[in-house]
């Protein structure tokens, strides 16, 4: 038995509350080493000694290249729980595992067990219910539309206060988005995420000058209100981009620092100022990515925290927005985010918060800061497997399972999955012109665990490697089968409880034939997805599923013993 591979961390993704009387317990063990694992639990403050314990059998739920993962659910009548594991390996050897370590015989001393001190209602991670069937459409406002089915691609510059200007590169506006809601609605998405729209100097608007005003290149507050109101009438939610890690060099507090130096009342609003502060090519103050136009805010300062809590509340109250995507979230103080979440939740209790974090986000996703983060890992895996085909089917499966187990289940379901964004090259550019690769990736994204997000124009086959290319103007007038494919996949996703909230189980993982199949299940529904990554047509048997299935694309019935899947294509099947 590989004792060194066995891991459990209490009060983490390995032990978390689902509701007031249910705890999910996970155990990581060496791959192929353990035959079974049970978790024994009891009342940690029971008046008798030894305490009565109950057994819950654990199930192996996933594997990666190094480990197997077991999971069990404790449905406890106790509010204070202690627990330990009884583990058997494939050779019949047994061990007990507790806070105290490993032993051949389990101690009766409850203080040496793993502890879940108290099942507090407020410690549950609660994700807004409306996000369960959410499919997001991500719009870069400058590049999308000026009016219905049109964007000029022409630059414009508008004079604003303090001798500053605001720039638009392609001419997109909020009114243009509003006039194209029919198109957006026909895609079947039910949420819009807009990159920054507040007053700023640059075309991308990540250098905010005024957090309480809409950028004049994009329109007015009334335009935003009209857009959100019309979206809500159509059942579409709206998420705005909040850039609170840094501001633009034209932000009034920073201008005051430039003017008044150490006497400025805003000195403590910024990081590492060297006086006299010089606005030059190489800034003598902390800035985002060393860019002088983006001085870093001191988000540990209470005045700064209070100001941005006010900003967060203001746009909920003013425009009835439904969420915030929070830029450079991992460079901002945790106390800032705790205060921000408390403030915006008081304003609207089902507001949805997404942090821009490119790596493991565990510390931000414990329930006190964000509901979700941008899942760049998902994009990396999909590029390797679908676009570039540089990892095998089994490697893909291992990476997906490891990704899905980074967080508690409800948090994983709320992760923002995407193939590309405004910060990376277009996914289709990695596909070498083969739209079958894109279609397979889209099909998988719509069936995977997590919230799917489509970057504007992906449904039209937009490509782009450099920033100016992947942020190019929307390709209006593009009517082809790729758009229809997106529409169908999104509709299937939204209408399936299993795809939105179900478990994820690998069914087929064949490197030689390049076949991957998995199931998404709830008590009421089972969906099986089969993907053929090879060029040859394959006849596939669904393991243990001899009943009838419905191909949700063709509406044709299929026999589970012989599913025909063409080369470089996928099938979504519903159990009937």
Give the ranges of each region predicted by the language model.
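Carbohydrate-interacting/catalytic domains
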Residues: 1-135, 140, 153-154, 162-163, ...
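Hydrophobic faces of well-ordered beta-strands that scaffold small-molecule active sites
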Residues: 135-137, 192-194, 238-240, 324, ...
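Aromatic/acidic polysaccharide-binding cleft in carbohydrate-active enzymes
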Residues: 142, 366-372, 413-420, 425-435, ...
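Conserved residues at the C-terminal ends of beta-strands
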Residues: 195, 214, 327, 457
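Short glycine/proline- and charge-enriched loop/turn segments
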Residues: 205-214, 288-292, 377-381, 467-475, ...
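Active-site-proximal helices and loops of the catalytic beta/alpha 8
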Residues: 228-236, 246, 251-261, 317, ...
């Amino acid at each position: 038995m590989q004792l060194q591979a066995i891991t459990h961390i209490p009060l983490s993704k390995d032990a978390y509350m689902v509701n007031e009387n249910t705890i999910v317990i996970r155990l990581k063990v060496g791959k192929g080493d353990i035959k079974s694992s049970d978790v024994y639990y009891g009342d940690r403050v029971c008046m008798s000694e030894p305490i009565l314990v109950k057994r819950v059998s654990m199930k192996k739920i996933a594997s990666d290249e190094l480990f197997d993962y077991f999971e069990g659910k404790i449905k406890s009548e106790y509010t204070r729980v202690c627990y330990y594991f009884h583990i058997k390996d494939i050779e019949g050897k047994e061990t007990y595992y507790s806070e105290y370590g490993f032993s051949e015989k389990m101690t009766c001393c409850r203080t040496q067990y793993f502890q879940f001190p108290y099942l507090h209602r407020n410690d549950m991670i609660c994700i807004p219910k409306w996000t369960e069937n959410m499919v997001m459409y991500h719009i870069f406002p400058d590049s999308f539309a000026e009016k219905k089915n049109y964007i000029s691609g022409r630059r414009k510059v508008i004079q604003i206060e303090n001798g500053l200007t605001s720039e638009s590169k392609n001419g997109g506006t909020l009114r243009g988005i509003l006039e194209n809601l029919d198109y957006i609605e026909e895609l079947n998405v039910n949420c819009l995420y807009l990159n920054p729209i507040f007053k700023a100097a640059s075309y991308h608007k990540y250098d905010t000058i005024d957090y309480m005003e809409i950028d004049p290149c994009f329109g007015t507050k009334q335009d935003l209100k009209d857009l959100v109101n019309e979206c809500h009438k159509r059942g579409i939610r709206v998420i705005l981009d909040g850039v609170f890690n840094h501001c633009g060099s034209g932000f009034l507090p920073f201008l005051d620092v430039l003017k008044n130096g150490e006497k400025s009342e805003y000195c403590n609003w910024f990081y590492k100022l060297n006086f006299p502060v010089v606005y030059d090519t190489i800034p003598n103050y902390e800035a985002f990515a060393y860019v002088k136009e983006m001085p870093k805010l001191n988000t540990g300062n209470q005045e700064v925290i209070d100001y941005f809590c006010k900003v967060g509340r203001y746009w909920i109250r003013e425009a009835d927005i439904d969420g915030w995507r929070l830029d450079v979230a991992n460079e901002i103080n945790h106390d800032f985010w705790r205060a921000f979440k408390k403030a915006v939740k008081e304003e609207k209790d089902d507001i949805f918060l997404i942090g821009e974090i490119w790596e493991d986000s565990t510390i931000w996703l414990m329930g006190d800061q964000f509901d979700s983060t941008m899942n760049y890992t998902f994009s990396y895996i999909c590029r390797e497997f679908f676009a570039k085909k540089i990892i095998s089917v089994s490697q893909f499966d291992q990476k997906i399972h490891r990704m899905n187990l980074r967080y508690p289940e409800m948090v994983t379901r709320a992760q923002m999955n995407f193939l590309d964004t405004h910060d990376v090259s277009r996914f289709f550019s990695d596909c070498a012109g083969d739209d079958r690769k894109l279609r397979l990736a889209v099909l998988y994204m719509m069936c995977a665990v997590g919230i799917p997000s489509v970057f504007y124009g992906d449904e039209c086959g937009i490509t782009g490697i450099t920033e100016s290319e992947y942020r190019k103007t929307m390709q209006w007038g593009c009517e082809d089968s790729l758009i229809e494919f997106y529409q169908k996949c999104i509709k299937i996703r939204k209408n399936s409880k299993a795809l939105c909230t179900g478990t994820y189980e690998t069914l087929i993982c064949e490197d030689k034939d390049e076949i991957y199949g998995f199931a998404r299940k709830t008590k009421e529904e089972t969906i099986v997805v089969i993907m053929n990554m090879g060029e040859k047509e394959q006849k596939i048997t669904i393991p243990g599923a001899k009943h009838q299935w419905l191909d949700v694309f063709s509406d044709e019935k299929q026999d589970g013993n012989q599913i025909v899947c063409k080369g470089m294509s996928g099938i979504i099947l519903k159990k009937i």
